[in-house]
């Protein structure tokens, strides 16, 4: 068990110390009603994940937002392990940006962790007036005590990868992090590594492009991203743009957790590959493809070939394993990245997806499978959709997954999700030899929510996790 410092700040001194942290007992995740037909606000659900609890795998609390149609998406903290050395800091507020509304909600999870309450609403009008941006997305806490939230658009819905700074105590909007006029053309995710004076960010598409669903013609027109932007952390400006070969729609990007590392990985959704970015011998940054998921030739789908669609990636805290989800194919994969240049597949599990046997899609040619996977049934429920957002326990032994991507795309690719709601599943992980196995006793069915089926998204543990905490 990790030793808890009584005079330290939030989180843990190192990623390896974090692995010794306590087992997760509750999980927070946003649930979305936009595009479901239910006229109710999105809400933050609290789920009990303690096997010893009588409420195990149940929603124990729901905090509705005050407005409709926010499209809650990702979440972050007011402070995390980057402030471990500051005993005045406490991880007690969850930051919830609204992808469509551009509001940012600050939720108090410190007073009653099992019953969060709304602390503050940062209105879109304040963000727009001070920063001239919209479509708030990823939130990370900084060692300065500030919170940084990136954006995807300008006020007209064009692409604009900007970074909004919030005061970590008052949550007032302070302005943008990047220099005036220095935003990237588009945005999505970001990760920083101060020891090397660098931040990296990715790009999805302009809000006008993605907001109403996926149109293949937009890909042909070059309206989706394929670049990594490398920023000077101290000067707040782009110093390099990495144009990826065969790297369409780079979404989640992660440096290795080791704060001295000079490499990481990005998941490219549409081209369905994992690319490794790294500092080269010249001191600049390079990128190379290290994993490719082959598309499947299909019949009965919107296109003749179906990509895996890698939508989320995670690194274990010891930087040994890489995990990612193929939302369309329906599997989660585990790779040993002891040699980051040559990841080795060590585990794979199918949790639904678009190619299950007996569905509307027939696979004509498959480079990996000899037959279509069976539909997943857990506790008598056939699981709709495919695995999307994933979260790993601190010790690396449990992987949680939800099945909703973004309500407009859910509606298009998995209409069953809209009718039935998404689910939360749990997979047991073999951290010795590698391997993934479903826990048949765990199911959170968001199709049975009191106000109607809901779409659950990103998962957060109260004490921090593999995708929220950055060590400096």
Curated annotation (Swiss-Prot):
Post-translational changes noted in the entry: The N-terminus is blocked.
Function according to Swiss-Prot or TrEMBL: Selenium- and acetaminophen-binding protein which may be involved in the sensing of reactive xenobiotics in the cytoplasm. May be involved in intra-Golgi protein transport.
One GO BP: protein transport
GO CC annotation, single: cytosol
SUPFAM superfamilies for this protein: 3-carboxy-cis,cis-mucoante lactonizing enzyme (SSF75011)
Protein's recorded name: Selenium-binding protein 2
Topology relative to the membrane: Peripheral membrane protein
Chief location: nucleus
UniProt keywords, alphabetically: Cytoplasm, Membrane, Nucleus, Phosphoprotein, Protein transport, Selenium, Transport
MF (Gene Ontology): selenium binding
Family in the record: Belongs to the selenium-binding protein family.
Modified-residue entries (Phosphoserine), positions: 467
Subcellular location: Nucleus; Cytoplasm, Cytosol; Membrane
InterPro entries assigned to the protein according to its UniProt record, in alphabetical order: Se-bd
Tissue: Mainly expressed in liver.
């Amino acid at each position: 068990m990790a030793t808890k410092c009584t005079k330290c700040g939030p989180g843990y001194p190192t990623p390896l110390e974090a692995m010794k942290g306590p087992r997760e007992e509750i999980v927070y995740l946003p649930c979305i009603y936009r595009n479901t037909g239910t006229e109710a606000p999105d809400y933050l659900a609290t789920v009990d994940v303690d096997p010893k609890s009588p409420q195990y795998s149940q929603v124990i609390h729901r905090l509705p937002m005050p407005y409709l149609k926010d499209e809650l998406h990702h979440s972050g903290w007011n402070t995390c392990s980057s402030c471990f050395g500051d005993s005045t800091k406490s991880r007690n507020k969850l930051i919830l940006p609204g992808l469509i509304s551009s509001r940012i909600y600050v939720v108090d999870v410190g007073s009653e962790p099992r019953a969060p309450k709304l602390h503050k609403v940062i209105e879109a009008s304040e963000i727009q007036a001070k920063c001239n941006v919209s479509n708030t997305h990823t939130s990370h806490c900084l060692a300065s005590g500030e919170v940084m939230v990136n954006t995807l658009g300008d006020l007209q819905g064009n692409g604009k990868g900007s970074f909004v700074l919030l005061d970590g105590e008052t949550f007032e909007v302070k302005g943008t992090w990047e220099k005036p006029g220095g935003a990237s053309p588009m945005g999505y995710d970001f990760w920083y590594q101060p020891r090397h004076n660098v931040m990296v960010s990715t790009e999805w598409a302009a809000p006008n492009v993605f907001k109403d669903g996926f149109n293949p013609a937009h890909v042909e027109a070059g309206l989706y991203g394929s670049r990594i932007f490398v920023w000077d952390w101290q000067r707040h400006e782009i110093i390099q743009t990495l144009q990826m070969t065969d790297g369409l729609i780079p979404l989640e990007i992660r440096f290795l957790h080791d704060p001295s590392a000079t490499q990481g990985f990005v998941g490219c959704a549409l081209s369905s590959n994992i690319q490794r970015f790294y500092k080269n011998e010249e001191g600049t940054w390079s990128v190379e493809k290290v994993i490719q998921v082959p598309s499947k030739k299909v019949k009965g789908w919107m296109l003749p070939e179906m990509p895996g669609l890698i939508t989320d990636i995670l690194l274990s805290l010891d930087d040994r394993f890489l995990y990612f989800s193929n939302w369309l194919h329906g599997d989660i994969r585990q790779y040993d990245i002891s040699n980051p240049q040559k990841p080795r597949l060590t585990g794979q599990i199918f949790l639904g997806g678009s190619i299950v046997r007996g569905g509307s899609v027939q696979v004509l040619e498959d480079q990996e499978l000899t037959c279509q996977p069976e539909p997943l049934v857990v506790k008598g429920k056939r699981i709709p959709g495919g695995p999307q957002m994933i979260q790993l326990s601190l010790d690396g032994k449990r992987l949680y997954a939800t099945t909703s991507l973004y309500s407009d795309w859910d509606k298009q690719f998995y209409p069953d999700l809209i009718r039935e709601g998404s689910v939360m599943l749990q997979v047991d992980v073999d951290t010795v030899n590698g391997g993934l196995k479903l826990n048949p006793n765990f199911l959170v069915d968001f199709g049975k929510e009191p106000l109607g089926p809901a779409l659950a998204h990103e998962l957060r543990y109260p004490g921090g996790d593999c995708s929220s905490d950055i060590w400096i």
